[in-house]
From Swiss-Prot:
Zn(2+) binds at C11, C14, C31, H35. S-adenosyl-L-methionine binds at Y74, T116, G117, H204. Confers strong resistance to mycinamicin (MM) and tylosin (TY). May function as methyltransferase. The gene is myrA. It comes from the Bacteria. This is Putative 23S rRNA (guanine-N(1)-)-methyltransferase. Belongs to the methyltransferase superfamily. RlmA family. It is an enzyme of class 2 (transferase). One of its GO terms (molecular function) is methyltransferase activity. One of its GO terms (biological process) is methylation. The keyword rRNA-binding does not apply. It comes from Micromonospora griseorubida.
């Protein structure tokens, strides 16, 4: 766990600060009340209390996602998110530099529902003054996220519940194709912080939906996202990003296997349908990046 993350973390049981247990290397985080949370050998800390009510992505889904993202297919989305995050972080310097606003250093970027941490890593590359925390309920995802970037850490938690973070401590919170917890996002964001939400548009993977029997994007998704956040945030702008992918049949299988359709598609039927596609398979990738300010 990166030491600069510790001031931001809180015990999920009692809410007190966490510190690394005395060991070399540290194998647990503890609070003054004695609650202890193991650090896995892969580097992530388990801050989940009890059993999560939501099932995280499986090891197979995470392996597919890592393979697909590593090929660069969604890099334009990561780049757009990184640019937005860099613009959202106020210019902050160490006390005594004479420029900007001297505050505690560095800033914290949190990815809620981080998956493998690839998008968080892109943001940290664009914001060199920040450290990052990947939150997810999937341990297979966090095994990768914990090593996604030298300035990143990772923690298992249920993002539908109380986040293991101090009040008003996050500079930028990013949320990519993941559940949104408006009250908690507002609690942990600084008053000058920013929430960046990436969701698929109706065009996303449209060429595959009918041919492969995939889940459709809800036409009312944008309205539902806005409604879920309206009590705690005000819109600060949005942009749409789309590009065309040229995929092999194997890459199409990987793409389907990494997302929610993997839970709802019969593998044998999917394989047969993909085998009937002509290569290269042209697929539209399209997302909306919405920016919000706390109110």
């Amino acid at each position: 766990m990166h030491p600069d993350l510790l001031p931001h973390l809180r015990c999920p049981v009692c809410g007190q600060p966490l510190h690394q247990a005395d060991a070399a290397p540290p194998r647990a985080l503890r609070c003054p009340a004695g609650h202890s949370f193991d650090i896995a050998r892969q580097g992530y800390v388990n801050l989940l209390t009890g059993r999560a009510p939501h099932v995280g992505d499986t090891a197979e889904m995470i392996a597919a996602r890592e393979e697909f993202l590593a090929a660069g297919h969604y890099d334009p989305f990561s780049a757009a998110l990184a640019t937005a995050a860099a613009r959202a972080v106020p210019r902050r310097v160490r006390p005594g530099d004479g420029v900007g606003e001297p505050v505690a250093y560095p800033d914290l970027v949190v990815d809620a529902g981080a998956g493998t941490g690839r998008h968080l890593a892109a943001v940290l590359d664009a914001v060199p003054t920040a450290v990052g925390l990947a939150l997810d309920v999937s341990k297979p995802a966090l095994r990768r996220a914990a090593r996604a970037h030298p300035r990143a850490g990772a923690a298992v938690c249920d993002t539908w519940g109380r986040l293991p973070l101090a009040d008003a401590t996050v500079a930028v919170l990013v949320n990519v194709f993941a559940p949104r917890n408006g009250p908690e996002f507002r609690r942990v964001l600084r008053p000058d912080g920013a929430l960046l939400v990436v969701t698929p548009t109706a065009e996303h993977l449209v060429e595959l939906v009918d041919r492969l029997g995939l889940l459709r994007v809800d036409p009312a998704k944008d309205a539902r996202v806005a409604d879920s956040l309206t009590r705690h945030f005000e819109p600060a702008g949005q942009s749409t990003h789309r590009h065309r992918l040229q995929l092999t049949r194997k890459e199409v299988l990987t793409l389907v296997g990494m997302g929610p359709s993997a839970w709802h598609t019969d593998p044998a039927r999917l394989t047969a349908r993909v085998a009937a596609l002509s290569e290269p398979v042209t697929v539209t990738a399209a997302v909306r990046l919405a920016r919000y300010r706390p109110i």
